[in-house]
Amino acid sequence: MNSTHHYEQLIEIFNSCFADDFNTRLIKGDDEPIYLPADAEVPYNRIVFAHGFYASAIHEISHWCIAGKARRELVDFGYWYCPDGRDAQTQSQFEDVEVKPQALDWLFCVAAGYPFNVSCDNLEGDFEPDRVVFQRRVHAQVMDYLTNGIPERPARFIKALQNYYHTPELTAEQFPWPEALN
């Protein structure tokens, strides 16, 4: 983690943006990430990110930004997660649903001045996903957002990140075409 980026900052930024309007708070978790809607025990929605990892918080915020109102009323937005160890077909389906969240991850990371790394999230799979091809799909979605507009919640979060970290407005030049990944 970059010495200038701490998960506590994301909690502060996110909660100042969304705690009141969306009754949602970002919470550091000790285990796997999960989204929990308000219930009888806790009167607010919780985005719980993994182990205090800055990148995990960014990614879970991305999923929340994509989820519509009905999905935000369901545990983990009503999605099932296919764990690491996916075959080629399941990995392809996983990547299809990860393009938009990872595009938001990239936008958020640039707005925060934090390094972005695409994640195929299949370390135990029976084949090696093509990270460059996947990042090109993510790049195309980033360009679409920059050209056609970023939805309201992620745009609000981007503006808050830029204000906090004193970063410039987002431009296409900040998102290079993935030639190869190290």
Swiss-Prot record:
Function: Is involved in the final hydroxylation step of the post-translational modification of translation elongation factor P (EF-P) on 'Lys-34'. Acts after beta-lysylation of 'Lys-34' by EpmA and EpmB. EpmC adds an oxygen atom to the C5 position of 'Lys-34' and does not modify the added beta-lysine.
Keyword annotations of the record: Monooxygenase, Oxidoreductase
Secretion signal, residue range per the UniProt entry: none
Regulation of this protein's activity per its record: Hydroxylation activity is abolished by NADP and increased by NADPH.
GO molecular function, one term: monooxygenase activity
Oxidoreductase listed as a keyword: yes
Domain of life according to the entry: Bacteria
Family, similarity comment: Belongs to the EpmC family.
A Pfam family reported for this protein in Swiss-Prot or TrEMBL: EpmC
GO annotation terms (biological process): post-translational protein modification
Name of the featured protein: Elongation factor P lysine hydroxylase
Entry keyword Oxidoreductase: yes
Reactions listed under catalytic activity: N(6)-((3R)-3,6-diaminohexanoyl)-L-lysyl-[protein] + NADPH + O2 + H(+) = N(6)-((3R)-3,6-diaminohexanoyl)-5-hydroxy-L-lysyl-[protein] + NADP(+) + H2O
UniProt note: phenotype after gene disruption: EF-P proteins in the mutant strain displays a modification of +128 Da, whereas a modification of +144 Da is observed in wild-type strains. Cells lack CadA activity (lysine decarboxylase).
Documented EC number(s): 1.14.13.-
